[in-house]
Protein backbone atom coordinates (compact mmCIF):
# COMPACT_ATOMS: atom_id res chain seq x y z
CA UNK A 1 0.00 0.00 0.00
CA UNK A 2 1.20 3.54 -0.71
CA UNK A 3 1.63 5.91 2.21
CA UNK A 4 0.44 9.50 1.90
CA UNK A 5 -0.27 12.54 4.03
CA UNK A 6 -3.65 14.28 3.96
CA UNK A 7 -4.44 17.57 5.68
CA UNK A 8 -7.67 19.32 6.69
CA UNK A 9 -8.29 22.49 8.68
CA UNK A 10 -10.94 24.10 10.85
CA UNK A 11 -11.49 27.54 12.37
CA UNK A 12 -13.15 28.73 15.56
CA UNK A 13 -16.41 30.65 15.76
CA UNK A 14 -14.37 33.84 16.22
CA UNK A 15 -12.68 33.62 12.82
CA UNK A 16 -13.90 36.57 10.68
CA UNK A 17 -15.38 34.39 7.92
CA UNK A 18 -17.19 32.27 10.50
CA UNK A 19 -18.56 35.37 12.25
CA UNK A 20 -20.04 36.32 8.88
CA UNK A 21 -21.53 32.85 8.38
CA UNK A 22 -23.07 32.87 11.85
CA UNK A 23 -24.57 36.34 11.38
CA UNK A 24 -26.13 35.30 8.06
CA UNK A 25 -27.62 32.15 9.59
CA UNK A 26 -28.82 33.98 12.70
CA UNK A 27 -30.79 36.33 10.45
CA UNK A 28 -32.13 33.34 8.48
CA UNK A 29 -33.28 31.64 11.70
CA UNK A 30 -35.04 34.78 12.93
CA UNK A 31 -37.03 34.99 9.69
CA UNK A 32 -37.86 31.26 9.55
CA UNK A 33 -39.00 31.37 13.17
CA UNK A 34 -41.77 33.83 12.25
CA UNK A 35 -42.37 32.75 8.66
CA UNK A 36 -41.18 29.25 7.64
CA UNK A 37 -41.85 30.07 3.98
CA UNK A 38 -39.30 32.92 3.99
CA UNK A 39 -37.00 33.10 0.98
CA UNK A 40 -33.64 34.27 2.23
CA UNK A 41 -30.24 34.92 0.68
CA UNK A 42 -28.21 37.03 3.12
CA UNK A 43 -24.51 37.83 2.82
CA UNK A 44 -22.39 39.44 5.53
CA UNK A 45 -19.16 41.43 5.32
CA UNK A 46 -17.36 42.23 8.55
CA UNK A 47 -14.29 44.43 8.92
CA UNK A 48 -12.77 46.72 11.53
CA UNK A 49 -15.64 48.30 13.45
CA UNK A 50 -18.28 47.59 10.76
CA UNK A 51 -20.73 44.90 9.67
CA UNK A 52 -22.53 45.15 6.33
CA UNK A 53 -25.48 42.85 5.61
CA UNK A 54 -26.78 42.55 2.04
CA UNK A 55 -28.98 40.22 0.04
CA UNK A 56 -32.48 39.33 -1.08
CA UNK A 57 -35.35 38.41 1.23
CA UNK A 58 -39.05 37.75 0.66
CA UNK A 59 -40.91 37.19 3.93
CA UNK A 60 -43.86 38.14 6.11
CA UNK A 61 -41.56 38.21 9.14
CA UNK A 62 -39.76 41.14 10.75
CA UNK A 63 -36.20 40.89 12.04
CA UNK A 64 -34.26 43.54 13.94
CA UNK A 65 -31.10 42.89 11.99
CA UNK A 66 -28.84 45.32 13.84
CA UNK A 67 -29.69 43.75 17.20
CA UNK A 68 -29.29 40.23 15.81
CA UNK A 69 -25.85 41.15 14.45
CA UNK A 70 -24.68 42.71 17.71
CA UNK A 71 -26.03 39.86 19.82
CA UNK A 72 -24.25 37.20 17.80
CA UNK A 73 -20.93 39.06 17.87
CA UNK A 74 -21.14 39.50 21.64
CA UNK A 75 -22.08 35.83 22.07
CA UNK A 76 -18.99 34.80 20.12
CA UNK A 77 -16.86 36.85 22.51
CA UNK A 78 -16.00 40.12 20.78
CA UNK A 79 -17.06 42.50 23.54
CA UNK A 80 -14.14 44.90 23.81
CA UNK A 81 -11.92 47.00 21.58
CA UNK A 82 -9.00 45.28 23.35
CA UNK A 83 -10.01 42.12 21.51
CA UNK A 84 -10.14 44.00 18.20
CA UNK A 85 -13.92 44.26 17.94
CA UNK A 86 -16.87 45.24 20.13
CA UNK A 87 -20.33 44.03 19.18
CA UNK A 88 -21.94 46.66 21.39
CA UNK A 89 -20.46 49.61 19.51
CA UNK A 90 -19.72 48.43 15.96
CA UNK A 91 -21.51 49.95 12.99
CA UNK A 92 -24.18 47.87 11.23
CA UNK A 93 -25.45 48.72 7.74
CA UNK A 94 -28.19 46.81 5.93
CA UNK A 95 -28.89 46.58 2.18
CA UNK A 96 -31.60 43.99 1.62
CA UNK A 97 -34.05 43.80 -1.29
CA UNK A 98 -36.69 41.32 -2.46
CA UNK A 99 -36.04 38.05 -4.28
CA UNK A 100 -36.15 38.38 -8.06
CA UNK A 101 -39.64 37.52 -9.38
CA UNK A 102 -37.96 35.60 -12.22
CA UNK A 103 -36.34 33.26 -9.69
CA UNK A 104 -39.49 33.08 -7.56
CA UNK A 105 -41.53 31.97 -10.59
CA UNK A 106 -39.33 28.90 -11.11
CA UNK A 107 -39.27 27.97 -7.43
CA UNK A 108 -42.98 28.49 -6.79
CA UNK A 109 -44.15 26.77 -9.97
CA UNK A 110 -41.70 24.18 -11.22
CA UNK A 111 -41.17 23.28 -14.87
CA UNK A 112 -42.94 19.95 -14.29
CA UNK A 113 -46.07 21.75 -13.11
CA UNK A 114 -45.89 24.85 -15.31
CA UNK A 115 -44.96 23.21 -18.64
CA UNK A 116 -45.69 19.50 -18.30
CA UNK A 117 -48.91 19.89 -16.30
CA UNK A 118 -47.81 17.56 -13.48
CA UNK A 119 -50.08 17.98 -10.44
CA UNK A 120 -47.91 16.09 -7.94
CA UNK A 121 -47.50 18.38 -4.92
CA UNK A 122 -43.77 17.67 -4.72
CA UNK A 123 -43.34 18.61 -8.38
CA UNK A 124 -44.64 22.11 -7.78
CA UNK A 125 -41.43 23.45 -6.20
CA UNK A 126 -38.49 23.86 -8.52
CA UNK A 127 -34.82 24.11 -7.64
CA UNK A 128 -33.80 27.63 -6.61
CA UNK A 129 -30.78 27.52 -8.91
CA UNK A 130 -28.86 25.27 -11.22
CA UNK A 131 -25.84 23.55 -9.75
CA UNK A 132 -24.12 20.42 -8.53
CA UNK A 133 -23.82 19.25 -4.94
CA UNK A 134 -21.73 16.49 -3.36
CA UNK A 135 -22.14 14.36 -0.26
CA UNK A 136 -19.55 12.08 1.30
CA UNK A 137 -19.15 9.50 4.04
CA UNK A 138 -16.33 7.24 5.17
CA UNK A 139 -16.14 4.50 7.78
CA UNK A 140 -12.95 5.87 9.38
CA UNK A 141 -14.74 7.65 12.27
CA UNK A 142 -17.89 6.88 14.33
CA UNK A 143 -19.78 9.74 12.62
CA UNK A 144 -18.64 8.48 9.18
CA UNK A 145 -16.56 11.59 8.50
CA UNK A 146 -12.96 11.79 7.23
CA UNK A 147 -10.57 11.72 10.19
CA UNK A 148 -8.52 14.88 9.36
CA UNK A 149 -11.51 17.26 9.37
CA UNK A 150 -13.18 15.31 12.20
CA UNK A 151 -10.19 15.95 14.47
CA UNK A 152 -9.60 19.51 13.22
CA UNK A 153 -13.18 20.47 14.13
CA UNK A 154 -12.90 18.89 17.57
CA UNK A 155 -9.70 20.80 18.24
CA UNK A 156 -11.15 24.15 17.14
CA UNK A 157 -14.28 23.59 19.22
CA UNK A 158 -12.19 22.75 22.29
CA UNK A 159 -10.06 25.82 21.62
CA UNK A 160 -13.20 27.94 21.96
CA UNK A 161 -14.42 25.98 24.98
CA UNK A 162 -11.24 26.50 27.01
CA UNK A 163 -11.42 30.22 26.23
CA UNK A 164 -15.06 30.53 27.24
CA UNK A 165 -14.86 28.45 30.42
CA UNK A 166 -11.73 30.22 31.64
CA UNK A 167 -9.36 27.25 31.45
CA UNK A 168 -7.05 29.39 29.29
CA UNK A 169 -8.34 32.88 30.14
CA UNK A 170 -5.91 34.85 27.98
CA UNK A 171 -7.16 33.39 24.69
CA UNK A 172 -9.19 35.54 22.30
CA UNK A 173 -11.96 34.39 19.91
CA UNK A 174 -10.05 34.04 16.63
CA UNK A 175 -8.32 30.73 15.99
CA UNK A 176 -7.49 27.99 13.52
CA UNK A 177 -6.51 24.33 13.64
CA UNK A 178 -4.98 22.01 11.07
CA UNK A 179 -4.45 18.26 11.15
CA UNK A 180 -2.21 16.11 8.94
CA UNK A 181 -2.87 12.37 8.97
CA UNK A 182 -0.74 9.65 7.41
CA UNK A 183 -2.70 7.08 5.42
CA UNK A 184 -1.64 3.61 4.33
CA UNK A 185 -3.85 3.20 1.30
CA UNK A 186 -7.30 4.21 2.55
CA UNK A 187 -6.53 3.49 6.22
CA UNK A 188 -5.53 6.28 8.63
CA UNK A 189 -2.49 5.05 10.57
CA UNK A 190 -0.62 7.97 12.16
CA UNK A 191 -1.07 11.55 13.31
CA UNK A 192 1.74 13.49 11.66
CA UNK A 193 1.19 17.19 12.45
CA UNK A 194 -1.19 19.39 14.44
CA UNK A 195 -1.19 23.16 13.94
CA UNK A 196 -3.04 25.40 16.40
CA UNK A 197 -3.10 29.17 15.95
CA UNK A 198 -4.99 31.17 18.55
CA UNK A 199 -5.44 34.87 19.11
CA UNK A 200 -4.25 35.83 22.59
CA UNK A 201 -3.87 38.74 24.98
CA UNK A 202 -0.70 40.83 24.92
CA UNK A 203 2.41 39.88 26.89
CA UNK A 204 1.79 36.13 26.63
CA UNK A 205 4.95 34.04 26.22
CA UNK A 206 4.60 31.45 23.50
CA UNK A 207 7.15 28.89 24.67
CA UNK A 208 6.60 28.96 28.43
CA UNK A 209 2.82 29.49 28.58
CA UNK A 210 0.76 29.32 25.39
CA UNK A 211 2.28 26.23 23.74
CA UNK A 212 2.21 24.08 26.92
CA UNK A 213 -1.37 25.17 27.68
CA UNK A 214 -2.55 24.37 24.17
CA UNK A 215 -0.96 20.93 24.33
CA UNK A 216 -2.32 20.12 27.81
CA UNK A 217 -5.83 21.56 27.57
CA UNK A 218 -6.66 21.39 23.85
CA UNK A 219 -4.68 18.77 21.95
CA UNK A 220 -4.05 15.94 24.42
CA UNK A 221 -7.69 15.68 25.62
CA UNK A 222 -8.86 15.33 22.02
CA UNK A 223 -6.26 12.68 21.25
CA UNK A 224 -7.46 10.75 24.29
CA UNK A 225 -11.04 11.13 23.02
CA UNK A 226 -10.00 9.52 19.73
CA UNK A 227 -9.07 6.34 21.58
CA UNK A 228 -12.31 6.45 23.53
CA UNK A 229 -14.15 6.64 20.20
CA UNK A 230 -12.34 3.54 19.00
CA UNK A 231 -10.13 5.39 16.51
CA UNK A 232 -6.78 3.61 16.71
CA UNK A 233 -3.97 5.52 15.08
CA UNK A 234 -0.41 6.24 16.22
CA UNK A 235 -0.40 9.56 18.12
CA UNK A 236 2.90 9.11 19.95
CA UNK A 237 5.33 11.25 17.98
CA UNK A 238 3.23 13.87 16.24
CA UNK A 239 4.58 17.36 15.59
CA UNK A 240 2.72 20.20 17.34
CA UNK A 241 3.03 23.74 15.98
CA UNK A 242 1.43 26.47 18.11
CA UNK A 243 1.22 30.00 16.66
CA UNK A 244 4.07 29.41 14.19
CA UNK A 245 4.33 33.15 13.41
CA UNK A 246 5.35 33.73 17.03
CA UNK A 247 2.54 36.15 17.90
CA UNK A 248 -1.21 36.42 17.26
CA UNK A 249 -2.48 39.46 19.18
CA UNK A 250 -4.29 41.19 16.31
CA UNK A 251 -7.13 38.95 15.18
CA UNK A 252 -10.79 38.81 14.31
CA UNK A 253 -12.19 41.44 11.92
CA UNK A 254 -9.33 43.82 12.79
CA UNK A 255 -6.84 41.30 11.41
CA UNK A 256 -8.82 40.16 8.37
CA UNK A 257 -12.13 41.06 6.78
CA UNK A 258 -14.71 38.28 6.95
CA UNK A 259 -17.23 37.18 4.32
CA UNK A 260 -20.10 34.71 4.28
CA UNK A 261 -19.38 31.54 2.33
CA UNK A 262 -15.60 31.65 2.31
CA UNK A 263 -15.00 28.46 4.32
CA UNK A 264 -16.86 25.94 2.18
CA UNK A 265 -14.23 23.19 2.51
CA UNK A 266 -14.16 23.52 6.29
CA UNK A 267 -17.97 23.45 6.24
CA UNK A 268 -17.99 20.09 4.43
CA UNK A 269 -15.33 17.35 4.29
CA UNK A 270 -12.00 19.11 4.64
CA UNK A 271 -11.06 18.55 1.01
CA UNK A 272 -11.46 14.76 1.16
CA UNK A 273 -14.47 14.98 -1.18
CA UNK A 274 -15.31 17.20 -4.11
CA UNK A 275 -17.38 20.37 -3.72
CA UNK A 276 -19.91 21.91 -6.10
CA UNK A 277 -18.90 25.45 -5.10
CA UNK A 278 -22.10 26.65 -3.45
CA UNK A 279 -21.91 28.00 0.10
CA UNK A 280 -24.54 27.27 2.76
CA UNK A 281 -24.94 30.06 5.28
CA UNK A 282 -27.63 32.70 4.86
CA UNK A 283 -29.63 30.55 2.42
CA UNK A 284 -33.08 29.12 3.11
CA UNK A 285 -33.66 25.48 2.06
CA UNK A 286 -35.30 26.36 -1.26
CA UNK A 287 -31.69 26.95 -2.32
CA UNK A 288 -30.40 23.53 -3.36
CA UNK A 289 -26.84 24.71 -2.67
CA UNK A 290 -27.77 24.03 0.93
CA UNK A 291 -30.67 21.57 1.06
CA UNK A 292 -29.34 19.22 -1.63
CA UNK A 293 -25.84 19.21 -0.11
CA UNK A 294 -27.42 18.21 3.20
CA UNK A 295 -29.42 15.52 1.38
CA UNK A 296 -26.28 14.18 -0.30
CA UNK A 297 -24.60 13.81 3.09
CA UNK A 298 -27.72 11.94 4.26
CA UNK A 299 -27.57 9.65 1.23
CA UNK A 300 -23.82 8.95 1.43
CA UNK A 301 -23.93 8.34 5.19
CA UNK A 302 -26.76 5.84 4.82
CA UNK A 303 -24.92 4.03 2.02
CA UNK A 304 -21.85 3.56 4.23
CA UNK A 305 -23.91 2.76 7.36
CA UNK A 306 -25.76 0.12 5.32
CA UNK A 307 -22.47 -1.58 4.52
CA UNK A 308 -22.82 -1.02 0.78
CA UNK A 309 -19.41 0.71 0.64
CA UNK A 310 -16.65 1.84 3.01
CA UNK A 311 -16.43 5.21 1.26
CA UNK A 312 -19.13 6.91 -0.76
CA UNK A 313 -19.36 10.19 -2.64
CA UNK A 314 -22.65 11.15 -4.28
CA UNK A 315 -23.22 13.98 -6.76
CA UNK A 316 -26.61 15.42 -7.65
CA UNK A 317 -27.34 18.18 -10.16
CA UNK A 318 -30.32 20.46 -10.77
CA UNK A 319 -31.66 22.90 -13.36
CA UNK A 320 -33.17 26.10 -11.99
CA UNK A 321 -36.95 25.90 -11.81
CA UNK A 322 -37.05 22.11 -12.28
CA UNK A 323 -37.99 19.71 -9.49
CA UNK A 324 -36.39 16.45 -10.62
CA UNK A 325 -32.58 16.30 -10.53
CA UNK A 326 -30.93 16.25 -13.94
CA UNK A 327 -28.14 13.95 -12.77
CA UNK A 328 -27.03 11.53 -10.04
CA UNK A 329 -23.55 10.01 -9.79
CA UNK A 330 -22.10 7.61 -7.21
CA UNK A 331 -18.38 7.01 -6.55
CA UNK A 332 -17.24 4.34 -4.06
CA UNK A 333 -13.46 4.43 -4.72
CA UNK A 334 -13.27 0.65 -5.13
CA UNK A 335 -14.84 -0.03 -1.71
CA UNK A 336 -18.33 -1.12 -2.85
CA UNK A 337 -19.66 -4.42 -1.52
CA UNK A 338 -22.14 -4.63 -4.40
CA UNK A 339 -22.08 -3.29 -7.94
CA UNK A 340 -22.03 0.53 -7.95
CA UNK A 341 -24.88 0.55 -10.45
CA UNK A 342 -27.00 -1.31 -7.88
CA UNK A 343 -26.14 1.31 -5.26
CA UNK A 344 -27.18 4.09 -7.63
CA UNK A 345 -30.48 2.36 -8.40
CA UNK A 346 -31.07 1.76 -4.68
CA UNK A 347 -30.51 5.45 -3.93
CA UNK A 348 -32.94 6.41 -6.68
CA UNK A 349 -35.53 4.01 -5.25
CA UNK A 350 -35.13 4.95 -1.56
CA UNK A 351 -34.53 8.72 -1.69
CA UNK A 352 -36.76 11.36 -3.29
CA UNK A 353 -34.36 14.14 -4.26
CA UNK A 354 -36.85 16.75 -5.46
CA UNK A 355 -36.33 19.96 -3.41
CA UNK A 356 -39.77 19.86 -1.75
CA UNK A 357 -39.27 16.19 -0.85
CA UNK A 358 -35.85 16.91 0.68
CA UNK A 359 -37.26 19.81 2.70
CA UNK A 360 -40.10 17.62 3.98
CA UNK A 361 -37.99 14.54 4.75
CA UNK A 362 -35.31 16.49 6.62
CA UNK A 363 -37.74 19.01 8.18
CA UNK A 364 -35.68 21.95 6.97
CA UNK A 365 -38.17 24.81 7.39
CA UNK A 366 -37.04 25.34 10.99
CA UNK A 367 -34.76 27.90 12.66
CA UNK A 368 -31.87 25.45 13.04
CA UNK A 369 -29.14 27.01 10.96
CA UNK A 370 -27.08 29.25 13.27
CA UNK A 371 -25.78 26.14 15.03
CA UNK A 372 -24.55 24.71 11.72
CA UNK A 373 -22.42 27.75 10.91
CA UNK A 374 -19.33 26.83 12.97
CA UNK A 375 -17.47 23.52 13.45
CA UNK A 376 -18.90 21.82 10.38
CA UNK A 377 -22.32 21.22 8.88
CA UNK A 378 -21.64 17.47 8.79
CA UNK A 379 -20.51 14.85 11.29
CA UNK A 380 -22.15 16.43 14.35
CA UNK A 381 -25.01 14.18 15.42
CA UNK A 382 -27.17 16.85 17.04
CA UNK A 383 -30.97 16.44 17.28
CA UNK A 384 -31.64 19.15 14.69
CA UNK A 385 -29.13 17.77 12.18
CA UNK A 386 -31.62 15.44 10.50
CA UNK A 387 -29.26 14.78 7.58
CA UNK A 388 -27.01 12.86 9.99
CA UNK A 389 -29.68 10.19 10.63
CA UNK A 390 -29.07 6.67 9.33
CA UNK A 391 -32.78 5.97 8.91
CA UNK A 392 -32.70 4.51 5.40
CA UNK A 393 -30.18 1.72 6.02
CA UNK A 394 -32.64 -1.19 5.89
CA UNK A 395 -34.40 0.18 2.82
CA UNK A 396 -31.08 0.62 1.00
CA UNK A 397 -29.91 -2.89 1.85
CA UNK A 398 -33.17 -4.36 0.61
CA UNK A 399 -33.11 -2.29 -2.58
CA UNK A 400 -29.51 -3.36 -3.23
CA UNK A 401 -30.39 -7.02 -2.74
CA UNK A 402 -28.59 -7.60 0.57
Curated annotation (Swiss-Prot):
Residues reported to bind Mg(2+): 17
Pfam family, one: S-AdoMet_synt_C
Cofactor: Mg(2+); K(+)
Catalytic activity field: L-methionine + ATP + H2O = S-adenosyl-L-methionine + phosphate + diphosphate
GO molecular-function terms, A-Z: ATP binding; magnesium ion binding; methionine adenosyltransferase activity
Protein name: S-adenosylmethionine synthase
Gene Ontology biological-process entries: one-carbon metabolic process; S-adenosylmethionine biosynthetic process
CDD domains with a match to the protein in the record: S-AdoMet_synt
